[in-house]
Amino acid sequence: MLLEGEGGGGPALQGTVSVNPPAITKYETVNVDVTVSGLLTSHRVFVQCQSDLENGLVCVAAYCPVNGTLRFRISNWSSNGIDGAARTWAYQAYV
């Protein structure tokens, strides 16, 4: 995916990571950080879970807060606590 004004090719980085969210209480949002070598705060990051999340869990953001860290903000929009399973997520990072 190219953004307007960019003439480059594909992603600077791409791969998969395992994301295992903690138990999330109802209506709460948590950060889940994973290490991605070479990821920079200047990268625009796109992620996609490779299997269905539990009903009520939503990834509301993914970004690089510090070099080498990919942060997932995962919200529980349900009225019950959810302990989500570890899942494989694909990522692409663009300059």
Regions found by a protein language model. Give the residues of each.
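Extracellular receptor-binding modules and their adjoining Ser/Thr/Gly/Asp/Asn-rich linkers
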Residues: 1-39, 67-70, 75-95
